[in-house]
């Protein structure tokens, strides 16, 4: 799977995807997110709302492990 630029295409509403966010020069992260309100969960398991304009790329979730 490859990252998709938000400027090129957005995910369908209600679909959970991975999103890449660059919040400032000291932080970037990968989140699971849903449109239209992006509820993001980072690796520390906290939840926050991320503005759409901060998310630069997204991709569909990978298939779960088979075992």
Swiss-Prot record:
InterPro entries: DUF551 (IPR007539). It comes from the Viruses. This is Uncharacterized 7.8 kDa protein in ral-gp17 intergenic region.
């Amino acid at each position: 799977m490859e990252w998709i630029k938000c400027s090129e295409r957005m995910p369908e509403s209600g679909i959970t995807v991975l999103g890449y966010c660059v919040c400032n020069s000291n932080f970037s992260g990968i989140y699971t997110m849903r449109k239209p309100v992006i509820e993001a969960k980072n690796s520390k398991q906290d939840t926050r709302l991320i503005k759409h304009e901060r998310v630069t790329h997204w991709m569909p979730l990978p298939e779960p492990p088979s075992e």
